[in-house]
């Protein structure tokens, strides 16, 4: 797992060559979510698109999780942004999240999925990789550059990350919260998540 850091609230240069206590789920206006909002179970994932372990989970577990729980309407899935790892990982993740927000809510998860899918090669040419993803969702290079250098949006991202870390006591990724009850931070198999969802459903 990767430990939490707050990104420097400054313009990104994009020289990018240089991741228990139960509480009631409460939505916030900037949440990004999928699935049935009225589902009995809400799964919140705290993750970073720059986190290698998060990317591994996204590739190996998320497709089956999405099919079984999100697409079926059994779970309300919420993704909350974190910035973790070393300076490069934080910078790349911040750019990825800013780009996903700029692409629009309807493309947010497509952008995140593409960034996760680009691991591990993402760090070989991060700027080029992210720009290519931006173009795939209809952004021009100029729009991409303006997006990832938007100080107001960078500050908003930092505020979301800090809120997630402090209010929800998250300091590592990935962290999963099932109906307000956090699982131990780190990679979890579908079977482990199945068990947590089953337990939450019976409460």
Residue ranges and their predicted role:
Residues 2-86, 158-167, 199-203:
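Extracytoplasmic thiol/disulfide redox context detector
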Residues 2-5, 21-22, 48, 62, ...:
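C-terminal cap of thioredoxin/glutaredoxin-like
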Residues 9, 44, 120, 134, ...:
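Short, flexible active-site loop motifs that bind/organize anionic cofactors or intermediates
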Residues 31, 84, 118, 145, ...:
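Conserved short-loop catalytic and cofactor-binding motifs
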Residues 36, 45, 91, 136-138:
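Short hydrophobic/aromatic segments of transmembrane alpha-helices and their interfaces
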Residues 38, 99, 189:
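Short, flexible micro-motifs
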Residues 39-42, 73, 95, 137, ...:
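Envelope-exposed proteins and targeting segments
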Residues 49, 55-135:
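Structural alpha/beta surface segment adjacent to cysteine/selenocysteine redox centers
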């Amino acid at each position: 797992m990767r430990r939490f850091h707050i990104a420097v609230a400054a313009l990104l240069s994009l020289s990018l060559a240089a991741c228990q206590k139960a509480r009631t789920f409460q939505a916030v206006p900037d949440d990004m979510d999928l699935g049935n909002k009225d589902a009995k179970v809400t799964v919140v994932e705290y993750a970073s698109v720059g986190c290698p372990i998060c990317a591994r989970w996204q590739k190996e577990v998320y497709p089956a999780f999405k099919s079984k729980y999100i697409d079926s309407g059994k779970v309300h899935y919420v993704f909350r942004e974190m910035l973790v790892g070393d300076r490069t990982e934080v910078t790349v993740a911040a750019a990825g999240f800013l780009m996903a927000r700029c692409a629009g809510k309807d493309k947010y998860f497509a952008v995140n999925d593409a960034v996760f899918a680009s691991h591990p090669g993402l760090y070989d040419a991060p700027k080029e990789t992210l720009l290519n993803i931006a173009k795939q969702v209809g952004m021009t290079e100029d729009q991409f550059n303006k997006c990832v250098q938007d100080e107001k949006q960078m500050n908003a991202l930092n505020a979301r990350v800090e809120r997630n870390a402090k209010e929800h006591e998250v300091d590592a990724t990935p962290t999963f919260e099932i109906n307000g009850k956090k699982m131990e931070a780190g990679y979890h198999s579908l079977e482990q998540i199945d068990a947590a969802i089953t337990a939450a459903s019976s409460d």
